[in-house]
Amino acid sequence: MPCSLAFVSRCRRGFVGVFGVAWRLAWRAATFAVAAVIALVTATPATAQVASPHAIDIPRWFTESFLDFKDEVAEAARANKRVMIYFGQDGCPYCKALMVANFGGGTPASREITAKTQKHFVAIALNLWGDRETTWLDGTRAPEKELARRLAVQFTPTLMFLDTDGRVMLRLNGYQPPERFGPILDWLVGGHARSESLADYLATRDVKAAPTPAPKGAYLMRNAAALARKPGGKPLAVMFESDRCAPCAELHREAFQRPTMKPLLGRFDVARLVPGQPARLTSPAGAAVDGKAFARDLQITLHPTVVFFDDGGREVFRFDGYMRPFHVESAFEYVATGAYRREPQFQRYLQARAERLREAGKPIDLWR
């Protein structure tokens, strides 16, 4: 199938140049037919019977796009829709979770999410390492992988929701489970963005959630208000959480209890902040600031969000998507070792780390 789609991708460029955008919808339908025929003709018995265990199945309602995003935004607007861009990669357990748990339709929540997404958005899938040519909103042409690099895509899946003018309404860096993705989608399609921030919208819903126990780990700073850094000191990990946050509790209960994680935590000062506490604090840069303003200035929207600062008080990395222990540990190691200075793409660092551990004979489970 990859060969088939590559063939179709090459053909479509000349086709569009000759016949124009009037053929777009017909060509999209033909793409699937041609790809299916070529796949059947070229498939060996093995490839015909055995699917790749690492492939991510994209739902059929995603658009087979020409990847000219200015045109895609305009076409979606004519249909009273907006564009949702998905960056993913094969072998990504979080991408699989998005496609199965969120968009798979196997549960009532998934069916509701899928119906709303189809109704309000034109969904377009991009490969983080792909070579298909894209034309971004500013007219810049680049293969998928270069566009991902330019947009600083650090996590898969990454979802970008564009408005009818092509502006980014929201960007989700990493996976969000259905119980969180559903309210985010409601905020996007329900007109709430015009009256309140996503952070405020989610906060009102979190009040109804069950309370979660506050962590008491020895790795946490006793004084979470003293965040100022000094040259040569430890880097800082600031954890923005709430007291009604199941993923926050899971992070402390699972990832932070791994034997390999505890030495890493010792290389950081780790502060846990919840909304409204502390009321005043000293920022990593040494400024006295209001606690709520500190979170707002950092554009904290989701809980948990972990923001890393170097010894100069500068933000160097963050994650706010749902992550299992392997990826949490990788993020802390990425900062603790200074690898972010040498390798700006976190996904490449993850690949190298996983390979290094495998060569050392250590089992790797990306979902554990």
Where are these regions (language model features)?
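Sequence context of c-type cytochrome heme-c attachment sites
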Residues: V270
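N-terminal secretory signal peptides that target proteins for export/translocation
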Residues: M1-L25
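Bacterial N-terminal signal peptides
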Residues: G17-T42
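Proteins that catalyze or organize thiol-disulfide redox chemistry
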Residues: C3, I38-L40, A46-V83, Q89-A115, ...
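Positively charged, low-complexity intrinsically disordered regions
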Residues: C11-G14, L25, A29, F181, ...
